[in-house]
């Protein structure tokens, strides 16, 4: 073990504010002191962050995005070896009519108002249980991936954690009580935090100041020589793993009707299912699908089911649903536990048939598109992408085929709902 001098971690006292012009668009970050990895409060704090925002969009902060009050917002925990932080990131909405971003001050006020619900313990046992089940399902999915397993093993080395903590993760999550979560939320999400106002900067891609070379000579390595450490690593025996190839013959096919076909395969790893509905239409023929699909990710259900209520209904079934679209196809992707597959499919079918899109979300989406397109001319990366796309595809380039900026303001809920229903 490497012995290092541990310096005391700075604790925020009251509200501290810092500002910096370092990005293409404004952002707000609220940063709180957290805990180091392996701390007894780490899992409870992760649950707190999930109560604020999660992949199912059922969190307290997720509601701000679903309601169109903020363009994007999320909470996360970063627990390192010696210290940790809790961070809330938010992107203000862009008002296309007034051609301006909402202020950092107004966004911070909205976020803090919602955060008080967590600080005051305003959540019930059912909500907490849904969050815990979602964390367990995501853990099961990670265990299907060799890449994620390797990442977890590397994190054990970095943080000095006990491997049994990973094996027993699900049991530890199940054991966390609502009283523990409320106590931890009140302890760490307090009035002591750093408010980082990241402001829009001009000419970020312009050529910067040229730095002088350092005064010292570079370290010269001996060509062909090996360090003792390299020799030790090479001496470690490596056993070749048994490669298990995919057996495509195990995939079952069934014709549902004249236009639909089912492909099915059993998941031998766990009880988690993943399902993808693939429709043979994309933005190449229906450009407005880009915006209809974006709204579907935060949609409710007719006649009167609001977006958050629909998300929580999915959450109670421990299912997660997302919509996506590319040039040629539209996708509806859902994952969850097999025991709730039928109920989750029934709920999803109702939303596909009777979507309830939100006008406030549409205005936020239009504002986001306006803001993004305004920054394109000052972004070398975007200009390079546009030029490459034109060289490859000429007039069929996505940048030329997309909806003109002047027409975005005319998008309506009725039109986008019709587009989505026509695609399905």
Locate each region found by the language model.
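Glycine-rich, charged/polar anion/phosphate-binding loops
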Residues: 12-17, 33, 71-76, 180-182, ...
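Peptidyl-prolyl cis-trans isomerase
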Residues: 176-180, 184, 356-362, 408-416
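Proteolytic maturation boundary segments
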Residues: 1-20, 26, 62, 165-279
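M16 family metallopeptidases and their MPP-like homologs
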Residues: 25-36, 62-174, 195-199, 207-210, ...
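Non-catalytic, conformational "gating/processing" segments within enzyme and secreted inhibitor domains
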Residues: 1, 192-193, 389, 396, ...
């Amino acid at each position: 073990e490497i012995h290092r001098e541990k310096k005391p971690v700075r604790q925020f006292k009251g509200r501290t504010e810092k500002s910096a012009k370092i990005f293409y668009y404004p952002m707000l970050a609220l940063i709180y002191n957290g805990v180091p990895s392996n701390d007894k409060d780490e899992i409870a704090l992760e649950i707190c962050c999930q109560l604020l925002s999660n992949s199912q969009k059922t969190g307290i902060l997720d509601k701000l995005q679903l309601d169109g009050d903020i363009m994007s917002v999320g909470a996360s925990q970063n627990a390192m070896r010696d210290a940790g932080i809790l961070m809330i990131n938010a992107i203000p909405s862009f008002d296309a009519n007034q051609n301006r971003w909402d202020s950092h001050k107004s966004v911070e006020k909205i976020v803090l108002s919602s955060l008080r619900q967590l600080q005051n313990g305003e959540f019930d046992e059912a909500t907490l249980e849904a969050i815990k089940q979602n964390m367990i399902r995501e853990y099961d999915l990670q265990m299907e991936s060799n890449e994620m397993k390797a990442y977890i093993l590397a994190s054990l080395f970095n943080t000095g954690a006990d491997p049994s903590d990973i094996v027993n993760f699900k049991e530890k999550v199940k054991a966390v009580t609502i009283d523990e979560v409320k106590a931890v939320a009140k302890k760490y999400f307090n009035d002591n935090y750093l408010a980082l106002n990241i402001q829009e900067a001009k000419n970020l891609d312009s050529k910067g100041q040229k730095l002088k070379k350092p005064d010292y000579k570079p370290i010269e390595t001996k060509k062909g020589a090996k360090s003792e450490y390299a020799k030790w690593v090479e001496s470690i025996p490596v056993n070749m793993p048994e490669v298990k190839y995919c057996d495509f013959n195990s995939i079952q096919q069934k014709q549902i009707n004249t236009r639909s076909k089912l492909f099915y395969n059993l998941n031998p790893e766990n009880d988690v299912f993943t399902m993808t509905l693939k429709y043979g239409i994309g933005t190449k023929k229906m450009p407005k699908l880009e915006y209809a699909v974006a709204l579907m990710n935060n949609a409710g259900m007719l006649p009167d089911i609001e977006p958050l209520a629909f998300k929580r209904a999915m959450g109670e079934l421990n299912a997660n649903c997302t919509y996506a679209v590319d040039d040629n196809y539209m996708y509806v992707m859902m994952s969850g536990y097999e025991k709730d597959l039928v109920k989750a499919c029934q709920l999803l079918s109702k939303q596909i048939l009777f979507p309830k899109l939100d006008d406030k979300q549409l205005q936020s989406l239009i504002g986001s598109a306006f803001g993004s397109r305004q920054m394109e001319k000052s972004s070398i990366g975007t200009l390079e992408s546009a030029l490459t796309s034109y060289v490859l595809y000429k007039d069929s380039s996505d940048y030329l085929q997309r909806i003109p900026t002047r027409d975005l303001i005319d998008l309506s809920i009725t039109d986008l709902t019709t587009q989505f229903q026509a695609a399905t």
